[in-house]
Curated annotation (Swiss-Prot):
Spans through the membrane: none
Location within or outside the cell: Secreted
Protein name per the record: Uncharacterized secreted glycosidase ARB_07629
Origin superkingdom: Eukaryota
Signal peptide: 1-24
Length: 770
């Protein structure tokens, strides 16, 4: 899954709202529970290096393995360099990793015998040498070179320790390359220069994003200290020279990738290891801005590594101290799982304030999740996904609409122009952009005329990948619901959008069956693709699921996206009551949902599975949601390097873990949190504006998790039977007390206890097919 996931199912946004607006006390050093290596194997793609909360600078060792999307992995790959900006948990292609520093000792101390290409310079690392703590990363390579790094907002600081003698190379002089490349070798053109008097290196380059269109420009300013320089110069391909001190490269003949950069060779210490330090300033504006960032944030010439490191730790302690726990004696496995997940949810979005080259603004600017209304105001459309200043590919719906509705219903109103927000989401719903692969929606002619996105849709208004007709239909339905929510709240047009939000029903084929390995599953009625003329197409309900062929945006693209019809059929977040009735009532709905989970059809490593874990609440069976949460945590979400079951997607998997373990899981775009027992005895959140504290407390809690079913609940001492609660609980504070037992009870099962739905029987007047 790629970084757009936060927009498709944006529980991460809600976590950001809570965490950024609360300030609870913490006991001791919460950083001891953060393991940055969680999710660095098995496709988690988590970034494990040094970063501030939402920081632009992200320093780590880059490796050459196929899973190096976050720079470093724990799967035994080789280190190719150390770079300063990364994303975390994303898919598509590896992102950033621009201008890596490459420490080495060259054969016979001959600069022309240095290893310039990634393939030649790759060196394995000593596994137990890896040390990661918030704001810090350290590693030792098999060639004896050790590296440690820390960061500020826009700069990285490295220590490289070179061994006194390197028998393998028969040399002793430290060399550091500054390479004109990135992780995915996407550089289009670049330039680099070196001042031989100050040893300052400036570089710039144009690169491709990981999952989108266009290019972005990146700039660095590198200073060195700690050892006297012997020689400096440039290299191109596999040759180097002391003159000139600057070089520019393009993509090369026939798009051949030209290897180039600068080198610095230092004198070695006469009596022990040689330390060379490097300060790297970063910018998206220009090289001078990169230098200013470095000089401002890590001033002077004798850089205080420990101060930078402790300042970074303090920033993380402040952020991670926002939520307080009473553990109740649970294993440290669960503490590490919880705090590591919160940590990963705060790596992105990245604060690029002051580093926006797209337009002049003094407003806060975040990338990798973009500032939505600012984007609309300056570029004309809400984005579905954004990274490295570039427009990212839309995966199904126009899910910025969901994010905006989510903020509105949760009363996040400070300095938000809601009229502009409504204008933006209505444009998504009514106007098709020329390129709807990166913004807005495609197929709007059909959406308005027949009430669904047809298979093989004839769409001449814009261009995009005309697949995913089922996924787009169910997501457009929810997008329109969210437009209606905002419209109703603002006293503007909303009924039309509420009506359109029922369009998902137009793809429900009541007699469709499903067979797995030739055996009838026993369930009848599934979504199916439909042509514009109303006739039905066919897609096997298990295709694109966890037990069949994977379907991505560009490879094996089908009528559903990254999940099959079996999973898509449950995505009606706004009208579960209608869906439950359509599937035969509560009992049959629960049986079908059980089958989805128990037959391994659902892939918990992608965001479409998030909501499906907790839909039992709508059928009056909240105990089964709690059971499912404990099924997936810690079996799939845990504190190991493989403890993220799929791409972490900029902390989306982390946010799933945090909300599930807190016992309050949001339905994004609605003022609804599903109530379950927290994985700890108590969880508290304090709101700094209201000064109120919201606490969820378990009674009869046991650390072995035998009592995971709610028997009764009270809110501020009064009986509480609803199995959900609104965001006002966090705004106003209070105590939600849950009495637990070993068996499912009648709590939260009544018709009036389930979360709200838009309602059955939505009139779809004007739609051709019903």
């Amino acid at each position: 899954m790629v970084s757009a996931a936060w927009l498709r199912y944006p529980s991460l946004l809600t976590l950001g709202i809570l965490v950024s607006r609360v300030a609870a006390q913490y006991e001791g050093d919460v950083l001891r529970y953060v393991d940055q290596l969680v999710g660095t194997a098995n496709g988690g793609h988590a970034f494990p290096g040094a970063s501030l909360p939402y920081g632009m600078a992200k320093a780590v060792a880059d490796v050459d393995g196929s899973e190096n999307y976050g720079g470093f992995t724990t799967e035994g790959s080789n280190v190719t360099g150390f770079s300063h900006m990364h994303d975390s948990g994303t898919g598509g292609k590896p992102s950033m990793g621009n201008f890596p520093l490459v420490p080495q000792i060259c054969q016979d101390d001959d600069i022309n015998k240095c290893k310039f290409s990634k393939e030649d310079r790759a060196v394995h690392y000593i596994a137990d040498s890896v040390k990661a703590r918030p704001g810090y990363f350290a590693i030792k390579l098999n060639n004896g070179i050790a590296a440690e790094m820390t960061v500020t907002e826009h700069a990285a600081l490295y220590h490289f320790d070179f061994p006194h003698n390197n028998a393998e190379s028969n040399g002793k002089l430290p060399v550091i390359l500054v390479d004109l490349t990135d992780i995915q070798d996407s550089r289009q053109n670049a330039a680099i220069s070196l001042d031989e008097d100050t040893l300052r290196v400036k570089a710039n380059g144009t690169f491709l994003p990981s999952f989108g269109i266009g290019t972005y420009k990146s700039f660095v300013c590198v200073d060195f200290s700690g050892a006297e320089a012997k020689d400096t110069g440039i290299y191109i391909s596999n040759r180097a020279g002391t003159q000139p001190k600057a070089i520019s490269v393009g993509r090369g003949f026939n798009l051949f990738y030209i290897k180039a950069g600068t080198y610095l060779q230092f004198q070695a210490s006469s009596n022990g290891p040689t330390r060379v330090s490097a300060r790297v300033g970063l910018s998206f504006i220009n090289e001078d801005q990169a230098c200013k960032n470095a000089e401002k944030e890590i001033p002077g010439s004798n850089w205080d590594f420990e101060k930078v490191r402790t300042d970074a730790e303090s920033a993380w302690k402040e952020k991670l101290g926002l939520i307080s726990l009473k553990s109740g004696g649970v294993s440290d496995i669960f503490q590490r799982t919880f705090w590591s997940a919160i940590y990963r949810s705060m790596i992105s979005p990245q604060d690029y304030t002051g580093e926006n080259p797209l337009w002049q603004s003094k407003e806060p600017y975040f990338d990798s999740f973009y500032c939505l209304l600012d984007t609309y105001k300056h570029q004309g459309w809400l984005p579905d996904c954004h990274m490295s200043l570039c427009k990212g590919f839309t995966q199904s719906g126009s899910n910025a609409d969901v994010v905006i509705a989510d903020a509105y219903v949760k009363s996040i109103s400070d300095n938000i122009d809601w009229d502009l927000a409504y204008e933006a989401v209505v444009k998504d719903a009514e106007v098709e952009p020329p390129d709807w692969s990166v913004e807005g929606r495609g197929g709007l002619m059909s959406w308005k005329s027949v009430g669904y996105i047809p298979a093989q849709d004839y769409d001449y208004l814009g261009t995009g990948i005309t697949t995913r007709s089922i996924s787009r239909t169910v997501e457009y339905s929810y997008n329109d619901y969210c437009v209606g929510v905002l419209g109703k709240g603002l006293g503007k047009e909303h009924e039309k959008y509420f009506q359109r939000s029922g369009n998902w029903q137009n793809l429900f084929k009541a007699d469709q069956t499903s067979f797995i390995d030739g055996k009838d599953t026993g369930f009848v009625g599934f979504f199916q693709p439909r042509y514009y003329n109303g006739t039905w197409g066919y897609q096997d309900p298990i295709l694109c699921s966890n037990i069949a062929a994977f379907c991505s945006l560009t490879s094996n693209s089908q009528e559903t996206y990254e999940s099959g019809i079996w999973e898509n059929q449950f995505f009606v977040p706004h009208d579960m009551s209608t869906l439950i009735n359509l599937l035969g009532g509560r009992s049959k709905f629960v049986a079908r949902l059980d089958y989805l989970h128990d037959s391994n059809i659902l892939y918990i490593g992608n965001e479409p599975s998030f909501l499906a874990t907790f839909l039992y609440h709508y059928a009056g069976r909240p105990a089964l949601s709690a059971k499912r949460a404990h099924t997936y945590i810690p079996s799939r979400f845990n504190d190991t390097t493989t403890g993220v079951p799929g791409n972490d997607d900029s902390g989306a998997m982390g946010s799933f873990t945090v909300f599930a373990m807190m016992g309050l899981f949001p339905n994004p775009g609605q003022n609804v949190y599903f109530i379950m027992p927290p994985f700890f005895e108590a969880v508290s959140i304090k709101h700094p504006v209201t000064g109120k504290t919201a606490t969820v407390r378990n009674v009869n809690f046991d650390s072995k998790y035998e009592n995971v079913y709610i028997q009764r609940a009270t809110l501020n001492g009064k009986e509480y039977t609803r199995n959900w609660i609104g965001h006002e609980f966090f705004l106003n504070g209070g105590t939600l007390e849950l009495t637990l037992g070993k068996e499912e009870s009648s709590w939260g099962t009544g018709q009036n206890d389930v979360p709200p739905s838009l309602g059955a029987g939505i009139k779809r007047d004007g739609l051709r097919f019903t």
